Amino acid sequence: MGFAMQRLLIRNISKLVSCDEGDTVYENVDLYAEDGVIRAIGPKLEKPAEEVLDAGHMLCYPGLINTHHHLYQQFSRNLPQVQNMELFDWLKTLYEIWKNLDTDVVRLSSLTGMGELMKHGCTTCFDHHYVFPAGAGDLIGTQFEAASELGIRMHCSRGSMDLSVKDGGLPPDSVVQTVDEIMKDSARLIETYHDPSFGSMRQLALAPCSPFSVSAELLRQSAILARQYHVRLHTHLCETKDEENYMLAREGMRPLAFMQTLGWVGPDVWYAHGIHFNDEELKLLAETGTGVCHCPASNMKLASGIARIPDMLKLGVPVGLGVDGSASNDGSSLMEELRTAFLLHRLNSSREAPSGYDFLKIATRGSARLLGRDDIGSLSVGRCCDLFLIDSRRLELVGACYDPKAVLATVGVRGPVDYTVVNGRITVREGRLARIDEEATAREARMVCEKYLGQ
């Protein structure tokens, strides 16, 4: 389970939004967890516990689950030279910075990026890391170490690129690898880190970067290896019209059709963005259980378009939520992303748009489904104790708590949550990270960032 046995009792929860199959909302209840698992929810529980919280006036929710990020981008946010670029030019410019990644940059960008997620109610993070400069060190191991330091549940990926500029791709030669190198390292990382057990704190997916930066052979071999090891598959797809035109010119087919020929559909696959799917492609996603991670802030910033989330939900396509990379968001708050998604889809029709509660379920149960997990994403007996608490007496929530299921999307929460709990352990206490020194970490991160950007 990742930690030694710990008992937690949260008393007097004003309202507990479970996001369970029955959409249950409990009032004035206690929650008891033992060894990271919820053992009881009910009034006036008499249970011994090492940690007891009084949650009177508190709203309680399942921990948010981030299903697409690029934590290494934390140190390339708000750069003036890329603010008015769209995806392809944006990537080409930033690769000249990212080619200098090392373990110090990855460690501190992971600590600060995941720390921000946790302070805003996130308890599980998936990161899509695909930039591996020669001689950079054990970048994925470094990410897992940072997650352990913070106490967050972590899904890393062995991303990859094998097409550089000389091959018709976008990245420089120094950050691409051969298919053989990638496959060997992928197997090593799965065998070293992937834990498929209940309550796992560490899992690994295989995640080639995108169809325009990897070869068909890399995609094919990644799918074969992932299924041999029973791990999941992830990549960017249908993010921009440029990608669609590139694939039509190179392969003579649309991106999803190309991916389907390589085995990249099914309930073990999820795509980031999925903006430009047509009607038939949405039906294929629904029929095969292939998922989509919605990243609205990034899609707006890069003028990529608006994913057809209302249509996906109607058809039964699995949908989760993600912040995307820190350089295209430019932040790491899934709470903010939840409200952004809610508002974005009301541009066309409030009647057709998903509700505030729909988006909460997308960010919890929906995201858990994309990661292939049924032990997180809702609050019920037998599930992992991943949750966050918000004091309903906050100034910004005055007059706003009549519908606790929707309030995170309709009104939003600007500052940090009061408590975040992962695996039955408090990881954010009174709005501050409980397991690291925030100021010291930020100070060290600024120094490393300045050196990194000054190269």
Q: Where on the chain are the PLM-derived regions?
A:
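Active-site gating loops and adjacent loop-to-helix segments of metal-dependent hydrolytic enzymes
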Residues: F75-V106, G135, L163-V179, S200, ...
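Metal-coordinating catalytic core of metallo-dependent amide/deamination hydrolases
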Residues: G135-G274, E280
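Alpha-helical scaffold segments that flank or form the walls of functional sites
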Residues: R77-H128, P133-R153, M183-F198, R446-G454
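N-terminal metal-binding scaffold of metallo-dependent hydrolase/deaminase domains
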Residues: M1-K47, M58-L59
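His/Asp/Glu-enriched, well-ordered alpha-helical/loop segment
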Residues: T261-D268, P310-R394, T410-V413
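C-terminal cap of metal-dependent C-N hydrolases
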Residues: C19, C384-A442
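Acidic, glycine-enriched loop/beta-strand segments at the rims
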Residues: L16-N28, L302-S304, I309, A368-K405
